[in-house]
Amino acid sequence: MYSTIQKMMKKSKVILTITLFCAATSPVVAQTDFSNNEDSMFAPVNNRNVRTDSLGSDKEIPKGLKVWTIDERFGDRQEAQVDTLQHMYMNTPFTSGLKGEYNSLGNLGSPRINRIFIDRRLDQGQFIFAQPFDCISTPVSEFHFTNTYSPITNVTLNSCGNRTNGEDDFKAMFAVNAGKRLGMGFRFDYKYGRGYYDSQSTSHFKYTMWGSYIGDRYQAHLLFSTLHQKATENGGITNDDYIKHPELFEDTYAENEIPTVLQQNWNRNNSVHVFFNHRYNVGFNRKVRMTDEEIKAKKFAMASKKENAAEDAKEEARKKARQEGKKFDEDAFGKTPKFAGRPDDAKIAGDEPAADKKEAKSTERIAVNGKSAADSIMAQEKKAAQDTAWMKNEYVPVTSFIHTLKFDNYSRTYIAYQTPADYYLNEYYTAGKYEGDSIYDNTKHWEMKNTLALATLEGFSKWAKAGLKAFVSYDLRHFELPDTEGGVMKYNEHSVSVGGQLSKRQGKLLHYNAVAEIGVAGEDAGTLAVDGDVDVNIPFLGDTLSVIGSGFFHRITPSFYFRNYHGRHFWWENDLDKIIHTRIMGTLKFAKTKTMLRVAVDEIKNYAYLSQSYNVTDNNQSARTGVTVQAKQSGSPVNLLTAQLFQDVRWGILNWENVITYQHSSKTDVIPVPALNVYSNLYLKFPVV
């Protein structure tokens, strides 16, 4: 333990040294101005009069980062919180989740499943093979788009262990804006776990690139990502007694020396994802005051423009002096007073005699009696001019025309170079890329979905208390599976659905959202999805008590891979009924006491799941034979009850966070869940001066 910590400290020192070196060299590079000299040679001009950066060292660069998520169907923006590097940061690399709510195989990036049923992702698409690796994938609805006043770079590396069982989690993110409307960025994610047991290594790579344009009339979001996921499969250790009762064995085994069921077996997933949403708004303009951040950014831009103009004037004077053969005095030019002067076209008033007759009193002029009154009027005019300078023209959208394109392309390959004798119960084909005891099962799937929507937006007038949308979607799906002759069987499915949304998100007291979608043609004809939520925020004891209700009714088609799958040892073609899933959930939240209570009831009819069975031929569990997997469907409904309490306590620098979850499943052989799940985190939090 001590040696591991010592190695990690050495690695941290190396990283810190590199960081300090980079920080120390940056000012040196900034002070070295490489430019074209008079001899047209590219060389440093350190010995010359080097001009300062146009930004100026005495001006503060605006800092600020806004992030938001979008609705996957309509692209509606929802403000989000920027990730911090303090609270719970040490848990971010863990496959088990921030609060240990996931079951996994223990290794970084290994397959996992959420123990809390109501927190599992409902719609993960058709490709079920990528679902257990959601630690590296990010749904569109959870991705953070960025808008930043200055470029932002964030690089993190979390590492532990050694060359045998070490784990590395690397992330690099860069975000920048081209103007206030266009934002873009990219991100690298790499997870590598060597594994504590034999044949347990994982390697996941993801590259993400995004862009957004937020204009008054036109708005767009683009998200592109590609993933490569690789996991070594060992089938578990051959005998649990290696861990439970190590004294039964004559030899002592290290973790990576314990025999496993499988060797040289790999599971690989590759995928490419493209999401594009854009809309055109029709509305009207109105004047509103800028935010403090916008005012700060505008002042910075004005100061930069003024300084750039001064630099341009100095450069012109320098060139003029060079052409005239004169010496240019930098100090004298900087001290030269600037006079506005009289305009060239100004008229000179003559000494004409005043009219003798009395002028008629104008009704359009304002009488100013005394200097104080004049000063007051001038101050008011100056204040009005300043107020006008910090006003902006806001475009209020009334109607939106929305289009969303979502494309996903997957490939999954299971490779085995050797398989234990009689390990599998069935063998459906021997032709293909590998023969003998080797396996090469490959399947491909791509899906393209287009959605068109027409929206009347909330809040464009005092009478528009809610937003209303109508949409139509077309979904095209393609699948490829091997056949018994070594070829490929191809399947195509299409679906057309229509629906609508009614929502209210503005205001403080009441919010609600209801969405309904009906399948009208194709494979998903007859499906129905109704989702809704409502929250009421009541002032209570000097704070806000939030009462939240949510629920849904889904009648959906089971995933293609529950209905059809072809592999060398697993094969099924099922005619499954539609899954009917109903949920009602209530949440009570009180920020003053840091308390939240959730209670949910689920009922699922025709639940689809995978069932595995095998034989154990001796007592030591080492000889497993007849392994088979089948997709099944539960005919009778499965009922689940979930009650969850969040309670945080803070007393001075002492913080204590607790989550207690109770779950009950009516059919544990179909949906097994732990009856009790407890999470507790006790820590000290204080400022460091």
What spans do the regions from the language model cover?
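Bacterial Sec-dependent N-terminal signal peptides
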Residues: 1-35
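A generic structural signal for short, non-catalytic loop/turn and secondary-structure boundary residues
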Residues: 16, 23, 148-150, 394-396, ...
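A generic structural signal for short coil/turn motifs at secondary-structure boundaries
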Residues: 22-24, 162, 194-198, 521-523, ...
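Membrane-proximal, glycine/serine-rich, low-complexity loop/turn segments characteristic
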Residues: 31-275, 279-348, 353-356, 360-363, ...
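A generic short-segment signal for beta-strand/edge and adjacent turn/coil regions
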Residues: 119-126, 139-143, 152-155, 176-180, ...
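Exposed, low-structure sequence patches enriched in small/polar residues
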Residues: 224, 258-308, 314-316, 380-689
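Membrane-interfacial, low-structure loops and terminal tails that flank and connect transmembrane helices
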Residues: 325, 352-383, 625-628
